[in-house]
């Protein structure tokens, strides 16, 4: 992987990630394909929304179908027939989400398989081995996602273990002679001093890119913005910056304004299945009765298949009838909305008009522009 920083405007960055499997223009949003599929979508449909790179889930793909099946296909790209770049998370967040059925120790995490109840063990080394079999273009280190809220002491101990796991992840990645990219993950909760220690430790180890983890886990938006403002300027300019698990459209805009290059989130796909649709002028909850006889398109400015061919009334009808086509059409639109938003941000940085783009984005949604301070 090669990262090229093409232009900046304020703290915002316009760049390009170059992989053997394709080029990703940044800032970029990665649709989430948890089980080797973006729910309800073919790879061709996902590509048609403008997606350049997908996120796969190491934890879930390890449990099902497993490494043996993946190796028989070649790798995850062959398995799911997506031949663009793929970033895989390490499984750390999913283990964190298991709550009471997992035990975190220095060597790794012991837990019960949520599918069949079997005892199972995941370590930094094992995560690197699984991601190697997946053929991930970007591999994420195995870390512990610091919970929120957490005291300074709890966040410190969690961050320190994540740093030790980062060293082990790097070592096993190198032993496997993996030639793809390996990203470190900055932890430390909402505490700036802990974020500093985490980043310094990761820089000492050395990675191809740096992710900001442990945000969007319940903390106030002000804390997220404060941490990004503090951390991003300290990440080397020539390395990509990835904000994990974020988020809402305004979170992407605010992340870009603070120097983030990459994002992922289940929000556009999950919300689509619940009839929660993002448009240029705000959210449309298509389930609401007022759309029953609305014969206008979902978003007059959107060029997606859904908006070009169907009315709000039809989408409302599909939702009320629980037709699977409704979820598919909604997903196509939401993914295209996110990619159009990212394209708009890239074009604005290219043109030096980011402030105007941001002002228009918030005005259309009838919201004030958040301060960068």
UniProtKB/Swiss-Prot annotation:
The active site is at 89 (proton acceptor), 264 (nucleophile). It catalyses: 7-aminomethyl-7-carbaguanine + guanosine(34) in tRNA = 7-aminomethyl-7-carbaguanosine(34) in tRNA + guanine. Substrate binds at residues 89-93, 143, 187, 214. InterPro entries: ArchSynthase1/Queuine_TRR, TGT, TGT-like_sf, tRNA_ribo_trans-like. Keywords: Glycosyltransferase, Metal-binding, Queuosine biosynthesis, Transferase, tRNA processing, Zinc. One of its GO terms (cellular component) is cytosol. Zn(2+) binds at residues 302, 304, 307, 333. The keyword Lyase does not apply. Pfam families: TGT. Residues 245-251, 269-273 are annotated as: RNA binding. The keyword Zinc applies. It is an enzyme of class 2 (transferase). GO terms for molecular function: metal ion binding; tRNA-guanosine(34) queuine transglycosylase activity. Its EC number is 2.4.2.29. Pathway: tRNA modification; tRNA-queuosine biosynthesis. Binds 1 zinc ion per subunit. One of its GO terms (biological process) is tRNA-guanine transglycosylation. PANTHER family: QUEUINE TRNA-RIBOSYLTRANSFERASE. Catalyzes the base-exchange of a guanine (G) residue with the queuine precursor 7-aminomethyl-7-deazaguanine (PreQ1) at position 34 (anticodon wobble position) in tRNAs with GU(N) anticodons (tRNA-Asp, -Asn, -His and -Tyr). Catalysis occurs through a double-displacement mechanism. The nucleophile active site attacks the C1' of nucleotide 34 to detach the guanine base from the RNA, forming a covalent enzyme-RNA intermediate. The proton acceptor active site deprotonates the incoming PreQ1, allowing a nucleophilic attack on the C1' of the ribose to form the product. Homodimer. Within each dimer, one monomer is responsible for RNA recognition and catalysis, while the other monomer binds to the replacement base PreQ1. Belongs to the queuine tRNA-ribosyltransferase family. This is Queuine tRNA-ribosyltransferase. The gene is tgt.
């Amino acid at each position: 992987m090669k990262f090229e920083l093409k232009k900046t405007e304020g703290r915002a960055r316009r760049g390009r990630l170059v992989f053997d499997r394709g080029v990703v223009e940044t800032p970029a949003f990665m649709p989430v394909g948890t089980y080797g599929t973006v729910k309800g979508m073919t790879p061709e449909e996902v590509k048609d929304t403008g997606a350049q790179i997908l996120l796969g889930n190491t934890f879930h793909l390890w449990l099902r179908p497993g490494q043996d099946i993946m190796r028989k296909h070649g790798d995850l790209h062959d398995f799911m027939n997506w031949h663009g770049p793929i970033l895989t998370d390490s499984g750390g967040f999913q283990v964190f989400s298991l709550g009471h059925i997992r035990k975190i120790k220095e060597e790794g995490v012991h837990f019960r398989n949520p599918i069949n109840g079997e005892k199972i063990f995941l370590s930094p080394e094992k995560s690197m081995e699984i991601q190697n079999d997946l053929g991930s273009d970007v591999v994420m280190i195995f870390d512990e996602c610091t919970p929120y809220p957490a005291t300074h002491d709890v966040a410190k101990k969690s961050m320190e273990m994540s740093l030790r796991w980062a060293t082990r992840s790097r070592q096993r990645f190198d032993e496997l002679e993996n030639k793809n990219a390996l990203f470190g993950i900055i932890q430390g909760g909402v505490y700036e001093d802990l974020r500093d220690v985490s980043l310094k430790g990761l820089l000492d180890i050395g990675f191809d890119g740096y992710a900001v983890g442990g945000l969007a886990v319940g903390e106030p938006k002000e804390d997220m913005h404060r941490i990004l403002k503090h951390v991003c300027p300290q990440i080397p300019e020539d390395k990509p910056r990835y904000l994990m698990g974020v988020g809402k459209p305004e979170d992407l805009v605010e992340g870009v304004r603070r120097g983030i290059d990459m994002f992922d989130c289940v929000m556009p796909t999950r919300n689509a299945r619940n009839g929660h649709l993002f448009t240029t002028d705000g959210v449309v909850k298509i389930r609401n009765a007022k759309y029953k006889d609305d014969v206008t398109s979902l978003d007059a400015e959107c060029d997606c298949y859904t908006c070009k061919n169907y009315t709000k009334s039809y989408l409302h009808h599909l939702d009320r009838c629980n037709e699977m086509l409704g979820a598919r059409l909604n997903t196509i639109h939401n993914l295209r909305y996110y990619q159009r938003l990212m394209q708009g941000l890239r074009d604005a940085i290219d043109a030096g008009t980011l402030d105007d783009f941001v002002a228009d984005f918030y005005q259309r949604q009838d919201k004030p522009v958040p301060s960068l301070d």
